[in-house]
Amino acid sequence: SQQEPRLVTHYASLDGLYGVDEVLDSYNNGEADFHQIVSDMANIPRSQAKTINLGLFYGMGKNKLQAELGVSKENAEDLFRTYHDKVPFVKMLMESVMRRAQDRGRVRTLLGRRCRFDLWEPNQFGIHKALPHEEALAEHGPGIKRAYTYKALNRLIQGSAADMTKKAMVELHKEGITPHIQVHDELDISVVNPLEAA
């Protein structure tokens, strides 16, 4: 369970990011609720920790997150500041993965699939259509950057979760077990004998 938070923890620990050791220790001690762990670290309610966690993992902007939290802009800013101060590895991982996407034009999932960032946009803030490199150069000149890199963590985490789920489905199939349905990070199967489920 909690596939995406575990992947965030995995990637943050690979990079040795500050603060992730507390989550790893909790996991190793049998505490498997990432949102509660983060709630305790940041001293904020679990529901707010979960909303912020998932919002950041899925590339939500501050305004959308504020609306999801149902708080004023000032309260949202305080929550974000507290969260990032007490749970620094999430923002550090987001920034690291965004830089990788900007520099390399891709991120690789757990099993090596490439998530590409092939479109470009002007460096300045505004509403612009993302374009292929040559078209962006022709329209905006050399002041361009890769578009949508703010979604890099989402692509890494969701893509890696998909890798894991698909691999599990293949392994089940090899064992003669056919999943009936896949919902998020869950595979539902039927067994004839309860011992098969173990």
Where are these predicted regions, by residue range?
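Conserved catalytic core of nucleotide polymerization and phosphodiester-bond processing enzymes
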Residues: 1-198
